[in-house]
Regions:
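Alpha-helical transmembrane segments and their juxtamembrane interface "caps"
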Residues: 1-182
Length: 182
């Protein structure tokens, strides 16, 4: 069920980009990349502030995660809070970029026609959607609760989004896991 929902969200992302056109979608991709860079600058300090605001489920005896090694189990709260901080900064900066994109969309411009441009725009939009889904699913994967871990582990699409996206998987693990807990 989760796999179907994730595939529908990705298909919706493709459709939205297909309808927008390539120029606007390139702008949104640049906005997402800028948001990711900005979030990478501020997420640590912000993540530390969430310890008092958001509860984190402590691991129970015999409970673990499918996506992280067991020796990191008692340090995953740092990854969880850093991920929340990163996602928050990313969301704020990207929302500003989207607002500016709406204004950009109102300017008269020549729309690049043709299926190739539309399909390219759809793929770019799907990549941005995939990155946002990957951030959210990776944050969920840090929570050591069976009610969260089991559905994620059983979903083929969720597992691949968390573990197998070529560039962003290693990058997110580098900034969220390796930089924080080693």
């Amino acid at each position: 069920m989760i796999s179907l929902l994730l595939l529908l969200v990705l298909a919706w992302g493709f459709y939205i980009g297909y309808r927008r056109g390539l120029l606007l979608q390139v702008y949104y991709l640049i906005s997402a990349m800028t948001s990711a860079f900005m979030a990478g600058q501020f997420y640590k300090g912000l993540g530390e502030q969430f310890h008092l605001l958001l509860p984190y489920a402590n691991p129970q005896e015999g409970q673990g995660t499918f996506f992280f090694p067991s020796d990191q189990l008692f340090q995953l709260d740092k990854v969880f809070y850093a991920g929340i901080g990163y996602l928050l900064v990313f969301g704020i900066v990207y929302s500003i970029g989207r607002l500016l994109g709406l204004l950009l969309h109102l300017l008269p411009s020549k729309k690049l026609g043709g299926k190739l441009f539309q399909v390219s725009a759809g793929i770019l939009s799907m990549l941005v959607t995939l990155f946002v889904l990957q951030m959210a699913l990776t944050i969920l994967a840090t929570i050591p609760m069976a009610a969260i871990q089991n559905p994620l582990e059983k979903s083929i699409v969720a597992k691949h989004i968390i573990q197998s996206i070529p560039v962003t998987t290693s990058w997110l693990k580098q900034i969220w896991v390796t930089n924080l807990i080693g």
